Amino acid sequence: TFYYLQGNHDNGSFVSSLEEIPDNLKMFGREWTSYTISTSGKNVVISGVELDCDNAGSIYSSLSLNVENYNIVVLDGQEASHISKNNAQVISLKDLKNKGIDYLALGHVHEYSMGQLDARGIYCYSGCLEGRGFDEAGEHGFVVLDIDDISGKTETTFIPFARRNVYVAQVDVTGCDSTFDMKKRVEEYLDTAGYARESLVKIELTGS
């Protein structure tokens, strides 16, 4: 089963061309939508809402979760403490605290990061699966949740996935007297840096 929450880049996505939505594709709308996965222990409930300018301020008061479940909440937007580069909706982590959330899955930021939401839950940007430019440097992949359905304890693991990663590296060329010397300095750096053959590396020359 696939759970698909559209973000600000998904207008006119592949779904609009489908004559019929497959049964195993679960989607979200402009109001909270929840899907329950029954287990022998705690139920796992995945809840999400697609944000726009009309509902972005009201989703916090309308979120109601059963604390006996393992609650995954899915949102796409920019966490409020960071400046958004585009028209992404702002997500207030403060207003999602103490709601019974175990795992807050966030989309929009293309870099992996994780933090504590409150005493119970964590939040995570899994990032994009592969860097698309030198502004998305570093390792990319996805996050696996291993949930104990009895205790509700969770282990999270970041899984590198990208076929090739993008890196930005600074090479100090102080003391080089020619472009040949600088080229040699860069080659020496690349020989020892350990980048995979498929990597894309942008070299920034520093020094004097």
Located regions from the model:
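His/Asp/Glu-rich metal-coordinating catalytic cores
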Residues: 1-146, 153
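Accessory, non-catalytic peripheral segments of nucleic-acid enzymes
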Residues: 151-208
